[in-house]
Every structure is written in structure tokens, then in C-alpha cells.
Amino acid sequence: MSILNTTEIMELIPNRYPILFMDYVDELEPGKSIVATKNVTINEEFFQGHFPGNPVMPGVLIIESLAQAASILILKSEEFAGKTAYLGAINGAKFRQIVRPGDVLKLHVEMIKKKRNMGVVETFAMVGDKKVCQAELTFIVGATDKKDK
């Protein structure tokens, strides 16, 4: 059961196809944690070139998936509602396993620090029971230009 579907996700963050890397939110505790899902399919545009005959989800797009989940967590906090979360830093990123078409990527994010217009989160992505990626992400929250939504 999902807490937020794709339409509801797009009401919170500005990302759209082909750069929206989240299908739904499974769990959400505003200001604390979020778990979201990305179903990785062979139809993803990036598989055309990464790599033909050996499709692998680029690690930077796993980080982007985690960043999008983190943005929702941050923007569901009362003080940041209606704003945009911009990725400011990536620390300690580690990639532990290849992600391929057919994998279900579970995106886990936990808020570790929130101060003024900044937030720091610990993230990791799982496929089944295997951790495929982890990173600490820092966000800066700013105004949103609503005319493009």
C-alpha cells in the first residue's frame, strides 16, 4: 500500500519524466524518515546507452532516486512546505551492487539534522535484502517558482 502515488509525488517535487525516479512512497514520518519505491524497468531511457546488451542503472541515478525521496521527506516538514529542496552535497557515497531492469529499488532516508534552510539525511537503497547504495546527502531549501509546475 502506498502513502503517496506518482501524481502526489509530482505535487511536492519538480522532477518529471524522464528524471522522476520514484514510483510511490511506502512509509512517511514527516521530519523523521521515508521509504519509497522505484521499479526499475528496461524501458528506462538511460538503459539505451548504459550499457547496450548489459543494462546497468547508473550509480548517480540511484543517488538521484535517494535525493528525490529525501526531498519529499524534507518538504513534508511544516516549515518547508511549498518550497524546493536542492541537493547541496553528497558524502560517503558507496555502491555495493549493480541494479538492473526488473529490480525493485527501496529507498530509505532518515533525517539526521535540520537547521534553518538546510537538512542532512542518511540514505540507503536496497534490492531485496541487499544494500546497493548508501550516502549522506545535504539539502538547501529555497523558494519554488510555481509557474513551471
UniProtKB/Swiss-Prot annotation:
Pfam families in UniProt: FabA
Family named by the database record: Belongs to the thioester dehydratase family. FabZ subfamily.
Keyword NADP carried by entry: no
Gene Ontology terms describing biological process: fatty acid biosynthetic process; lipid A biosynthetic process
Main location: cytoplasm
Molecular function per GO: (3R)-hydroxyacyl-[acyl-carrier-protein] dehydratase activity
Cellular compartments annotated: Cytoplasm
InterPro entries membership: FabA_FabZ, FabZ, HotDog_dom_sf
Protein purpose: Involved in unsaturated fatty acids biosynthesis. Catalyzes the dehydration of short chain beta-hydroxyacyl-ACPs and long chain saturated and unsaturated beta-hydroxyacyl-ACPs.
Top-level taxon of the source organism: Bacteria
SUPFAM superfamilies registered for this protein in UniProt: Thioesterase/thiol ester dehydrase-isomerase
Disulfide bridge partners, by residue number: none
Keywords: Cytoplasm, Lipid A biosynthesis, Lipid biosynthesis, Lipid metabolism, Lyase
Presence of keyword Transferase: no
Official protein name in the record: 3-hydroxyacyl-[acyl-carrier-protein] dehydratase FabZ
A Gene Ontology cellular-component term: membrane
Active site residues according to the UniProt entry: 50
Residues that span the membrane, as ranges: none
